[in-house]
Amino acid sequence: MPAQIDKASSFQALHAAPGSFVIPNPWDGGSARILEALGYRALATSSGASAGTLGRRDGKISRDEALAHCELIVASTDLPVSADLENGFGSTTADVAETYRLAAE
């Protein structure tokens, strides 16, 4: 599995390249592997998909649940993954910074 810094560099290169790219939203580890096998070059989590896997509506999951979902997707693929972290799961800058710190681990 590529290191986080390698995935970040790959993701940055996709954005710097001419043209555009499609970034699909897997909802679980299996769909992440399928999308990778289909040739997509990056993936993105979806707060709606994450909530749906728990039987809830978008916006109705906790920070810990969102981070666990992101961790599952990241662990299932070698591709870079962009995370949908809603509003950062906090009402203060410190709370949002903590969410992003935890996500980067």
Regions found by a protein language model. Name each.
Residues D28, L35, I73, D84, ...:
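Conserved, mostly hydrophobic/aromatic
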Residues A42-L67, N87-T92:
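Glycine-rich, proline-tolerant flexible connector loops at the mouths of alpha/beta enzymes
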Residues M1-N25, G29-L38:
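N-terminal amphipathic alpha-helix/helix-capping segment at the start of soluble metabolic enzymes
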Residues V22-D28, L43-T45, V81-L85:
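Hydrophobic faces of well-ordered beta-strands that scaffold small-molecule active sites
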Residues D6-S10, A17, R56-A83:
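Alpha-helix-loop-beta-strand connector modules within alpha/beta enzyme cores
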Residues A68-L72, E98-E105:
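Alpha-helical scaffolding segments of alpha/beta enzyme cores, especially the outer helices
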Residues S31-A37, F89-R101:
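Catalytic cores of alpha/beta
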